[in-house]
């Protein structure tokens, strides 16, 4: 909750950007705007750095986004996305990114060692303590290293080069995982609320019930700032976000069942229908959330957007297995087990805060090939599965032109192009 005030400041910047785009009726890519909001938050969480990329370009953000555009966009066909220059471009951009993040690491190490030396010499400012301020991931990593290597607290040279490299790589992972998936969730939620006005109506009513009727984004932000836990009262909005993540899970996890340490020698996968077990020692297991989320035993009418399915007292599917012991692992956009996403609570919180402030202010309409997407049907064209037809371009998946594509994580096709309208003018 200590990050809530910072999230609110960034949220209001996002809201104002949306207002400007609504007033100009500009065609823009929502996912790119949401990305800058999300990466500003994770920059603060990871390194206690203010990127402020919603206001002006930041070198780390620009280099990071460049890195993502250089990643392959297919994971199966090796020649489908062939680019002979890519390895060299990635090498150069990686060096640049490592240098930029390395400077942030060095800045923090310098500050810590200077403070520790001043305290040792009796010249420290007691009012400024690393223990008193917000703890970033970088802070926590340095704390752990200093505990194992006490000399590093006062001597910068005591930090090993190997530790620094690992720390830079870890920070890159946190920044990547902490922004790309959240921005896609925000974009898809705003897209789906336009397609389902009955769901939007209930979200708006819930926001009114918690923060007051006809509150502005600034008033809602003030309410959350004074009572941060009030955001947890938005149970229906939370269900909306969960349903969005069910339909459009941004990532999944590959589990390597290595034989090297013998830990996987008794690992089996069991066919639930036949009960037959198969050894998978030495294989990689890939639990694909997108497929699991369409299992009708847990999620009836799986391609439909029905947030109520996550509210046990209101679910239209009381016979589904979702709320049984067997269903506890059915919803898995952040994966499960020891390799699950450690930032899932942060991701859900920043999504709730932003959406609570923005959805009553503006309405987003996706627009593909000059066509506004105002309605949805599960299968819209004969080419629903067009990638199986040579030379045919896929137009929709499950009726969505904003289907997911591989761009770092799973992001909306075309970065979700569309236009905004002020709800006060609708």
Predicted region positions:
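C-terminal helix/juxtamembrane-tail motif
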Residues: 411-426
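Cytochrome P450 heme-thiolate monooxygenase catalytic core
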Residues: 2-186, 202, 207, 221-224, ...
């Amino acid at each position: 909750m200590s990050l809530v005030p910072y999230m609110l400041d960034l949220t209001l910047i996002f809201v104002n950007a949306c207002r400007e785009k609504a007033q100009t009726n500009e065609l823009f890519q929502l996912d790119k705007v949401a990305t800058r909001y999300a990466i500003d938050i994770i920059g603060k969480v990871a390194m206690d750095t203010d990127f402020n990329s919603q206001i002006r370009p930041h070198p780390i953000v620009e280099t990071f986004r460049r890195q993502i555009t250089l990643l392959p966009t297919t994971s199966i066909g090796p020649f489908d996305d062939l680019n002979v220059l890519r390895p060299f471009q990635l090498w150069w951009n990686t060096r640049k990114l490592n240098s930029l993040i390395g400077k942030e690491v060095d800045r923090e190490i310098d500050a810590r060692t200077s403070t520790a030396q001043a305290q040792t010499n009796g010249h420290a400012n007691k009012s400024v303590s690393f223990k008193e301020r917000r703890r970033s991931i970088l802070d926590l990593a340095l704390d752990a290293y200093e505990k194992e290597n006490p000399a590093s607290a006062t001597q910068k040279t005591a930090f090993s080069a190997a530790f620094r490299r690992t720390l830079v790589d870890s920070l890159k992972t946190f920044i990547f995982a902490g922004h790309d998936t959240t921005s896609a969730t925000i974009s898809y939620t705003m897209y789906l609320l336009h397609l389902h006005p009955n769901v939007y109506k209930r979200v708006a009513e819930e926001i009114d019930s918690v923060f007051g009727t006809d509150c502005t984004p600034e008033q809602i932000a003030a309410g959350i700032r004074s009572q941060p836990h009030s955001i947890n009262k938005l149970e229906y909005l939370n269900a909306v976000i969960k349903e969005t993540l069910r339909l459009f899970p941004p990532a999944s996890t590959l589990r390597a069942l290595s034989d090297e340490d013998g830990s996987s020698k008794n690992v089996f996968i069991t066919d639930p229908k036949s009960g037959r077990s198969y050894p998978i020692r030495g294989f990689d297991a890939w639990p694909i959330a997108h497929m699991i989320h369409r299992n009708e035993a847990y999620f009836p009418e799986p391609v439909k957007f029905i947030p109520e399915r996550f509210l046990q007292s209101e679910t239209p599917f009381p016979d589904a297995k979702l709320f049984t012991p067997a269903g506890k692992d059915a919803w898995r956009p952040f994966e499960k087990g020891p390799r699950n996403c450690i930032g899932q609570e942060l991701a859900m919180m920043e999504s709730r805060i932003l959406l609570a402030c923005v959805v009553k202010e503006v309405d987003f309409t996706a627009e593909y090939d000059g066509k506004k997407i105002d309605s949805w049907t599960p299968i819209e064209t004969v080419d629903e599965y067009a990638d199986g037809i040579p030379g045919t371009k896929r137009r929709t998946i499950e009726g969505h032109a904003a289907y997911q594509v591989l761009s770092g994580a799973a992001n909306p096709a075309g970065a979700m192009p569309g236009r905004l309208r002020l709800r006060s003018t609708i």
